[in-house]
Structure formats: C-alpha cells, structure tokens
Amino acid sequence: MLCENAAQSNDYFEFIGEYSGVLDYVKEEFNTECITVIDQRFAIAYVKKNGRTSIYGQNYPYNTIPRCFGLMDTQMLEDVGVAQVRRSTLDLYGNGVLVGMIDTGIDYEHPAFRYEDGSSKIYSLWDQTIEGDPEDTFLGYGTEYTKEQIEEALKSDVPQQKVPSKDESGHGTFLAGLIAGNEDNETGFSGIAPNTGLIVVKLRKAKDYLKEYYCIDPKYEAYAETDIMLAVHYIDHIAEQLQRPIVIFLGIGTNLASHLGTGPLDQYLSGRAMLRGVAVVTSAGNEGQARHHYSGQVSQNDAKVEVKVGESEYGFAMELWGLAPNRYYVDIESPSGQKTGRIQGGLSGQRYVTFLLEKTRLIVEYFTVDTSAGAPVIVMRFQNPAPGIWNIYVSDDGVGNREFDLWLPITNFISEDTFFLESTPYNTLVAPSNTGLLISCGSYNSSTGSLAIDSSRGFPRNAVKPDFTAPGVEILGPLPRKRYGRKSGTSVSGAITAGIAALMLEWGIMQKNDMQINTTRIKNYLIRGARRDPERIYPNREWGYGQVDLYETFLGIR
C-alpha cells in the first residue's frame, strides 16, 4: 500500500501530532514517514497496523488519539434582527462572503442553493466518502467537485451521474439552507445570508478501530477529529484561493474532552479564529438535560458516583477530569457487587478488568498529566456493560483543589437510559464550543421565549460560554429532494448565528467598515447588541449574554 493511500486505507491508525515547525518530531514519535501537514503546529500521522486491530496498550499520549464527534441534531428572521436590517439601508445579504460547512454534505440540486441566474452557490464540494485518485485531491482522499462541475451536473437530466454526492441524513442540507438558502415564496422561508457562497465538506464516518476504541455502537454515526481538522484545512485552502472572507461552521461536538478548549481541534480552530476575515461558529450542544455530566469533590471519604446503565447498551467511554496537582483514583463496582479495587498508577498506564457475573469488560486508562490540558484524566471504557447501577468511587491524594468532573458520551452516542443518577446540567457545552476564542451559541424557543430544554449550559472552568442564544426550536429550512421541513437543536441556532457572522463579515470586509474584523470582534459586536431580560443576571449560564439581535448590534455601532 502506497503512503499516499494511507488516509483512505483501513490498514493504518491515525494520530494527531504537534511538531512546532519541526516535522521530524512527529515522524520520530510515531515511527512513520506517512504524514499530512495541517498547519505549522499540527500534522496527522498514519501508522501501519501490521496485524494490530486495536490501539489499546500502545502507550500513545491520549491527546494524540482522534476524538469521535457526533451531530448536534437539529418567524426566525424577525427574531434575530435580520429582517429589520434588510429593511434598513445596510443592504446585507452575504455578498462576497463564503461559509464553510463541515457536516453530512448537501443536496446540491435543491433550488435553495442556486443564485437568481441559475448558477450554484457551492464553490467547492469535498466528499470524503467517495474514493477517488489520491493524486487528484488536495488532501489525498475523497473526491473534490468544483463549482463548474456542479453546474455542469445541474444542466444534466441525471445530475447524480456527474456529481454523485448526496446528503443522506439531510442535516447538512438543512443547516446550509438556514445560512445561505434562497427565499421561497411558497413556504415563506429565507436563509440568513442568501447571497453567501458555500464550501462544503461531507465528512466520512470514523474508521471502525476508532469507534471500537471509544466503545461507540456501530449503528451511531461518528466522525473522526482528523477528518474534521482536514476539512477545516480544506476550507481555508479554497477561501485563500478565492480571496474571500470565510465563516467556518461546525454543527458537531463531543463530550469526551477536558471542556477547557485544549484539544487539537479546539486549538486549531482557535488559531483560525484570530485571523482577519475569519469567523468560527460552533453549536453549544444538546446536553442540558441529558444527565451526562457529574461534578463532585472528594472529601474525607471517597466520593460515590452512581451511573445507571440501560438495557442492551453496546458500550460507552466515560472520562474523569481532575485538577492539577492532585492525583485521582477510581474503584468501580458492578451491579452484582464485584469491585475492581482502587485503580492507581504512575505517569500513565492501563488496567483491564473482566466482571465475571456481568460478562462486562472494563478498560481503565489513567494519565497523571494530560499533554494538552495539563490536568489528570482517567478514561473508563465499558464493553458490553451490564444493565443496572454501577458505582464509581473516586479518591485522591488530597493535594490542592479536590474537585473533579465526569462526562458520559453525547446523546447521539449512547441510549437515553444510561445516565448519572445525580447529575448537573451546568458545564455541559460540547467540544469545541467550550473553546474561549470561538463563537458558541445556545438555543431558545422563539415562540415561547424560553430556553430550549436540551440546550447545553455553562460555564466551563476557564470561559464564559455560551456567548448568547439564537432560535433553535421548530425552525423551517430546506430538506433533501427539494422539500422543506422543521428541525430543532443547537446546530440550528448555530447555523443561524453563522449566517449572521457572514453578514458581519460583509459589513466589515466587503463594505470596508471594519477591515480588522475577526471572530473575536464579531462576537463582541453581537454580545453588545444581544437582548437581555432585566430579570436575569448576565453573563448567564443558560443564555450567555442574551439573545442575538443583529439590528440591535448595528444600532449600538452607529
């Protein structure tokens, strides 16, 4: 197998390496010459499996193993102040701006994605799922389709024969439509920035070995951190070629993270967010009522955490994050009463436990210092977990702050019958939305004015998040096969915010009102203009700084 085929081959493991300009560091760390450079900090290393089926027990740093991300499920123009802006002299429709979509693809045949002259709004489409010639693609796998190829397909009687890319789930199509969809007189729909151009990446599903590592049921759709980082790299590349300002939008997330914005994807996006003419927008997540977060503190006795596991749960991974310089230990008790005993280790290590009565296999990995967050982390992976109550007894060395957090996977990776019996709805923003430099948006119901019940809540330990909220309940948008329908979730409110960010880039860069505009400046403009309830204290763990309102933002600028 040639090295350039490593990205599409199942014969390789993938790792994320940091090299600080010296690529030999990555080659030496992973003992491979197969490297894809993302930027001056990150690269992806492809390591031949050589008969190995799993990365268990291979002693790679935890932050080098790609995380798995999932989708954030999914009279709006008036609610966010866009209709008022259109009625003003600002004339903002997204002209000259691009939006990069990293999701499930797009129905490029939908009329919502064609300009008035019939040309496509999609400037480039990279479908990671369609195998092509590695030499013909920018990053060595998948297939790229240009604007010209898409428009040629649209002229055909059978467009799919020329550009065979589909959005099977409709998630990406819906979000792209909220951002850039045309006005539809029959349904009354209009995207936020209908003149915006699109760069679309359809993510391929994570490789089997990675889903196995995180104990994710094969029936769930998961996406690898490496593919997402390369998608961002691709969007940057196309935007640079076209010399256009760009919004990068991600309607995906994960719970398995430090929740401090320290993961490779988090840091890579932070670097993009600081650039002039770039806005990075994320969805806060739908974990507010999922009962997937436990926050506790070790006192004189061990802290006891109860996890209820549902029937027929395939498996799951759970992470414990503590605070340095403390060292944490776990003792895990099965529903039948079998205990692992106190699991402890040195700098890092693994322990395998089989529960005989339950036929459950447990793999515990511990890292005294996580490379990226600098904090202790214990990763517990349950294979074929028995239903019932599992007890996690947490102890520590009693040094410094003795607080800790436990997170179960996101809703889309685990059944609704598996949760913490005592949980907290706070600090539930998914990665990368808990990253300080990015724009993070929660969700509210514009019909009732209330917070969406599932909207993830703040605050992370080191940031005020979410930044604000946007409508995200029963919102109208385009669906595959030229249809329209309604969806809910913070990916919806995030897409609305991404459209608003595109209008801000048009105002700043294309209309030359703020030539230094970037993610931070857009965020601060929108925070100043957010509507706030006088009965609430801000910043607020549920609402951030309020409800986003573009018109009020411009009233505050004048």
Q: Model regions: which residues?
A:
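Extracellular S/T/G-rich loop segment that most often corresponds to the catalytic His/Ser-adjacent loop
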Residues: W126-Q128, G132-E135, L139-E148, A290-P376, ...
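Edge beta-strands of jelly-roll/beta-sandwich modules across compartments, strongly enriched
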Residues: V399-T411
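Autoinhibitory propeptides
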Residues: L2-L98, G105-K121, G388-W390, F419, ...
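Hydrolase catalytic cores
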Residues: A176-I179, G188, I199-Y209, D236-I246, ...
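Catalytic cores of secreted or luminal carbohydrate-active enzymes
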Residues: V247-I248, L265-S295, V548-L550
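Short acidic, glycine-rich surface-loop motifs adjacent to enzyme active sites
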Residues: N63-C68, L230-L260, S283, D397
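Noncatalytic modules at the cell exterior or secretory-pathway interfaces
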Residues: G315-F316, F382-G398
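Subtilisin-like serine protease catalytic core
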Residues: R87-A224, Y314, P325-N326, T435-L437, ...
